[in-house]
């Protein structure tokens, strides 16, 4: 379980400046701490692993624009897999992907009801923003191996089929940073 320790910071409300008829009640998901101080949307990854189960290359992940937010807020995937960006809202959105280093990945416009499929070609943390609605963001953590998990509402995670060995556990969170 990934838990928060200390005094929980008060998150400011998101500044909804456009499309207010659709973009109501958008939560600030940059730090969600649930029951028992569990942190949601942290990505737990094994480091130093060189063998084990093969990456499922045909896997397709979905990131939806729904209620003027990206759902899910954080996802993890492998190099070689795909993300389908979907727009379930009745307004235009974009999915502009940048590595946290600032290096661009792609930028697609998503009209209502449209989808766009993009490959994940480089490992790292990718921030997704909507250029039309600047409060919208999500993250994709792209790994070269399948030994990772995104924490749930209780801060819990599960990584299956770990081969015997000694590994480091790395935890990444958009607000709290990285811990090993």
Show where each model-derived region lies.
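Extracytoplasmic copper-binding redox domains, predominantly the cupredoxin/blue-copper superfamily
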Residues: 2-180
């Amino acid at each position: 379980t990934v838990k928060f320790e200390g005094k929980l910071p008060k998150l400011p409300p998101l500044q909804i400046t456009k499309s207010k008829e659709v973009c109501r009640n958008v939560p600030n998901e940059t730090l969600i701490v649930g029951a028992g101080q569990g942190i949601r949307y942290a990505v737990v990854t094994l480091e130093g692993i060189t063998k084990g189960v093969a990456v499922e290359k045909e896997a397709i992940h979905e990131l939806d624009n729904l209620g003027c937010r990206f759902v899910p807020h954080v996802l993890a995937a492998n190099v070689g897999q795909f993300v389908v960006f979907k727009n379930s809202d009745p307004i235009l959105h974009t999915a502009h992907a940048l590595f946290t280093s600032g290096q661009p990945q792609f930028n697609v416009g998503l009209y209502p009801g449209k989808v766009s499929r993009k490959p994940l070609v480089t490992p790292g943390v990718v921030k997704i923003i909507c250029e039309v609605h600047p409060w919208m963001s999500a993250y994709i953590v792209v790994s070269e191996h399948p030994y990772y998990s995104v924490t749930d509402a209780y801060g819990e995670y599960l990584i299956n089929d770990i081969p015997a060995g000694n590994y480091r556990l790395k935890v990444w969170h958009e607000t709290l940073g990285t811990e090993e």
